[in-house]
Amino acid sequence: MSKLEPILEFVFTAHALKEMARRDITEQEVQEVLANPEQMEIVQDGRAVYQNKYVVSKTSKTYILRVFVDIDIKPPHVVTVYRTSKIEKYWR
C-alpha cells in the first residue's frame, strides 16, 4: 500500500472545535492523523475520513481517531472528529 497524501494545511470548523472540546481531543492529535494518516476513505462527494489507530497506555485499550475533512475546499476543512473503540467496524 502506498503512503497516503498528508494534509498539512487545514482549518477547523466551529463544529469540529466544539466537538473536540467535548470529546477531549486536541488539535495536535488531529494534526498527527492528517500529517501521517494510516487510512483514508471517501465517505461522500468531497468528504473523506482520515484515521489512525492508537493504544491508550493507561488502559491498554485500542482506539481509532477519525477525522472527517471536506477535501474539495482549499484549504481543507476539518468538519468533525471522534474516537471509537469499534475497530472491526471502521478499520479496513
Region roles according to the model:
Residues M1-R92:
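Ribonuclease/tRNase effector modules and their secretory precursors
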